[in-house]
Amino acid sequence: LPKSKGGKLPDDLYNIITDEEKRKKLVVYINPPYAESGSTKKRDAKVGVNESMIHKRIFSKLSSYSKRELFAQFLARIYIEIPNCKIANFSTLKNLQSSYFSDFREIFRAKLAKIFLAPADTFDNVKGKFPIGFFVWDSNINEKFHEIIADVYEKDGEESIERKRIFSYEEGKYINDWLRPTWNKNINEI
């Protein structure tokens, strides 16, 4: 609702969102929160950070890891509350590939229209050697993610000749499924 009707949304923004023609030109730049609730063996790690309105409304029924991720809640909320929009974000690939995000992929069914990858250490204060994906989603098209071909960029910004095929692995076994039966808990190794 707009502020003039007791809501939190500025009236001008509300008018744009509710007008189909104006909404086509709307671009919202938001830095989604990247935090995850949980605990470690030694200490609590941001316990309760996931307790949001969207968590209670949508993710409370799920029993997966994805509901602990604020960026997943953020994407789901945009998808549900601002229909028929384009969403762009950057993150790791876990929302596409992780078995923990299969429940999220059931809810968030915007078509992944385009993705490109860059090394994580391209960003300030990131030391890891893993890809960061720049995603463009189209919520006009209801489609569960299964796979896509991504362009790959090097740290210097040059496009690599390599392209990467990214899967959701919904039907396949993960490496842990293969390793778990051979794991020896007494000596903590395979």
Language-model regions, residue ranges each:
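Short, solvent-exposed loop/turn segments at secondary-structure junctions
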Residues: 33-37, 94-96, 140-142
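Conserved Class I SAM-dependent methyltransferase catalytic core
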Residues: 60-120, 135
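A short acidic (Asp/Glu
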Residues: 38-41, 97-104, 126-130
